[in-house]
């Protein structure tokens, strides 16, 4: 055991399903069969800046609803892992990256959001499948370029209260982000 402890560094159990390893918390809680809390909370910026990006129990419930109702059905349909580039962001992390503290990524007010893609799946086709098959509060096809299937990513939010079913497309026009209704 001594050799393993030296190899791993110091660690302790942090309660629920968190493991604290050398000062970093690993959220190994499974929210669904294929989606973990760690996937939705990891942030290189938070790690670099020493920001505690661990959600509260209420925020975890919102993330779990997103995972159950949006992320897992996508994972099951495509039978491929999702690459989640941004999930939960604590308010301090939002400020650090220049995002709104009212973003659904904060997972407050019974809603949560994630940005993701699936390698090898056209992001526009993925957005269409989600739009046609799942209930979401807001979906955004972000920075997709026609003719470049792996460009951009998908943003989806889910509310445990009520979902608007709003779909937008985000594009950069003259250096500014422009959001338009996405109807195609």
Each predicted region: which residue ranges?
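Extended, low-complexity, intrinsically disordered C-terminal regulatory tails
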Residues: 69-99
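Amphipathic alpha-helical interface surfaces
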Residues: 59, 66-70, 93, 112, ...
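Extracytoplasmic cell-surface/polysaccharide-interacting catalytic and binding patches
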Residues: 19, 24-77, 160, 172-184
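Catalytic cores and adjacent binding grooves of peptidoglycan-active enzymes
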Residues: 17, 27, 104, 108-112, ...
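Aromatic (phenylalanine/tyrosine) cluster motif
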Residues: 11-13
């Amino acid at each position: 055991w001594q050799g393993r402890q030296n190899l791993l560094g110091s660690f302790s159990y942090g309660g629920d399903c968190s493991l604290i390893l050398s000062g970093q918390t690993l959220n190994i809680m499974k929210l669904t069969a294929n989606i973990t809390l760690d996937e939705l909370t990891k942030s290189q910026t938070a790690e670099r800046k020493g920001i505690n990006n661990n959600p509260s129990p209420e925020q975890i419930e919102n993330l779990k609803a997103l995972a159950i109702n949006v992320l897992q059905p996508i994972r099951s349909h495509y039978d491929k892992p999702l690459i989640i580039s941004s999930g939960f962001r604590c308010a301090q992390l939002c400020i650090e990256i220049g995002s709104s503290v009212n973003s659904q990524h904060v997972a407050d007010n019974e809603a949560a959001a994630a940005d993701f893609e699936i390698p090898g799946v056209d992001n526009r086709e993925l957005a269409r499948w989600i739009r046609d098959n799942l209930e979401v509060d807001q979906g955004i096809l972000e920075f997709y370029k026609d003719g470049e299937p792996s460009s951009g990513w998908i943003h989806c939010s889910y509310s445990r209260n009520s979902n608007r079913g709003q779909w937008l497309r985000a594009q950069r026009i003259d250096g500014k982000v422009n959001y338009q209704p996405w109807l195609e």
